Amino acid sequence: MEVEDSGGVVLTAYHSYARAQPPNAESRCAPRAAASHPLSRKSIPRCRRINRMLSNESLHPPAFSRSNSEASVDSASMEDFWREIESIKDSSMGGQEEPPPAEVTPVDEGELEAEWLQDVGLSTLISGDEEEDGKALLSTLTRTQAAAVQKRYHTYTQTMRKKDKQSIRDVRDIFGVSESPPRDTCGNHTNQLDGTKEERELPRVIKTSGSMPDDASLNSTTLSDASQDKEGSFAVPRSDSVAILETIPVLPVHSNGSPEPGQPVQNAISDDDFLEKNIPPEAEELSFEVSYSEMVTEALKRNKLKKSEIKKEDYVLTKFNVQKTRFGLTEAGDLSAEDMKKIRHLSLIELTAFFDAFGIQLKRNKTEKVKGRDNGIFGVPLTVLLDGDRKKDPGVKVPLVLQKFFEKVEESGLESEGIFRLSGCTAKVKQYREELDAKFNADKFKWDKMCHREAAVMLKAFFRELPTSLFPVEYIPAFISLMERGPHVKVQFQALHLMVMALPDANRDAAQALMTFFNKVIANESKNRMSLWNISTVMAPNLFFSRSKHSDYEELLLANTAAHIIRLMLKYQKILWKVPSFLITQVRRMNEATMLLKKQLPSVRKLLRRKTLERETASPKTSKVLQKSPSARRMSDVPEGVIRVHAPLLSKVSMAIQLNNQTKAKDILAKFQYENSHGSSECIKIQNQRLYEIGGNIGEHCLDPDAYILDVYRINPQAEWVIKPQQSS
């Protein structure tokens, strides 16, 4: 291949499209592979890009690293990775000294569990404060989620007792379990799931009915209802700091907010025959209605999980068809900030329970935190950049400078060969960096003089120099362990889906914008020679990094997994940022429980100790109390089954609409468009607006145009309905 003069631009790598011969088994060893590479591994920068956080079980070659037909990561494919590492070293801007590798600080397990409890919104279990949010969160947990919380709280209390000899609330005060300590749900899943039902039954958990009680049920509750029967499963808490709504086995959460009555767990779970298939079918159905951890736990019990080999070719990644329920699908940006905070907490609990089912524990090591800059562009936290940008544009979700990088590459670089393998002109990149730091926030930087090659280089540097990695590197070892067990790509997707939902808002929005942008680059692969695999390999050291020490083999293993995670994100970008409906259901229950707890009535305290399961089976109307309560319609003169929709920005600002089983959100929008079709400006306005569900058991919810409104109305009859513009990034 002839390389033409490119104005000082160095082509750092070129991907060969010829199929590489699979090397022998010895080539799996990272040091051997590194030795064969022309670049000395000693030249890798001191600021290592992948974290050293492997468990002992992860120190052998992963099952996904090779298939019978082709190596998933052969030496030719990894050239992009090693050359990117070398390019990172060579492009140290302005002669800046790389910080030395951070030492991993050993911490006791109790401290890690305390941090985890804080991260999932259960800091009240540590502080002892009486807050409704923590109580409401506990009231919504599924069986597997509660087992995950129970295990970590038990570890925390045991560690604190040994360390400080202080009185700490017993785990039984929260979960109402028997005198025996909680079983290890994070051990080997084979051992966990073997044995009799009595030996292996998961701990019982707290639960709310999912609806607000009426006055009658409040007044009829007595303290005697909360008494523990010697042979029963309920225990009166010895501490009132955490409200126990009920201690019963919980069925999988469905999107309609109620479990299948009288059905065993395994019958309530959707068909999982896909787990037995080694060869991915052309397309598979994907449901967001059932808790992933519950689903995989039942699959493991029935030995349904089979290994699935991961190959290099893009087409082997399964195509998923998402099952759209009558509630439609919800993007992460369609919910209010407060509700998304609850989604993050629930997602981390669910992710932990998901890995627990496989005997994998999310472990963290404490490293020295890097404080970001408070001005400029590079090395500044995303939240700081957004705070400054929102002074110019209050609705912005992705930093403006990042959007500018995208635009610059899209203008003329989408068809440029090797666009993200080019190192660019070092002198120009250094100059533009300094000017961006000094002039961008004042809107004085001249973007027209920047070439797309320099924009691509600085885009990578932007993410690489963030104070903390865009994606949490502590998840990679757990993902490696999951891959070693070789589950189907669907299981990998579920783990990744929860990881994305657990990201902070700024990271999640930036990651979504980045994956959307890279898919535009991949769409021009025939001209730019940047395939799905090329992008994932080049970006792995830029998106997953840490300044911790690590070995060569660990670096290669983690790099392979990071590249695979990016590959999955790119492949499933359109559905990864959809919020699982079972999590939205739990948020609704949390909000209902919070409203209930805020009443601060003695009768409410009694209700919290009532046997919910008996009440639901004995009185079917209880599950629909919220819908039938007179107070639910007291504040409005609108008849049952009729909603009043408000459109404050349109000429016709309000309309009463009779709902039926076929009324969709887009039908209501069409009706308003017809009523406001007097001028072209009104038509344009309605086309850019969406129907929102506001209040009741949700903060704010931008509804899917295909959502059936009568179904939404039935689970949230106290909501207000507003047509307004959808928030953009």
Swiss-Prot record:
Residue ranges of the Rho-GAP domain? 380-577
Q: Locate the region Disordered.
A: 20-42, 55-105, 176-236, 612-631
Q: Cellular component GO terms, alphabetically?
A: cell junction; cytoplasm; cytosol; nucleoplasm
Where is there biased composition of kind Basic and acidic residues?
80-89, 195-204
Q: Which GO terms describe its molecular function?
A: GTPase activator activity
GO BP annotations listed: negative regulation of stress fiber assembly; regulation of actin filament polymerization; regulation of small GTPase mediated signal transduction; signal transduction
Q: What does this protein do?
A: GTPase activator for the Rho-type GTPases by converting them to an inactive GDP-bound state.
Q: What is this protein called?
A: Rho GTPase-activating protein 28
Q: In which organism is this protein found?
A: Homo sapiens
This chain is encoded by the gene named ARHGAP28
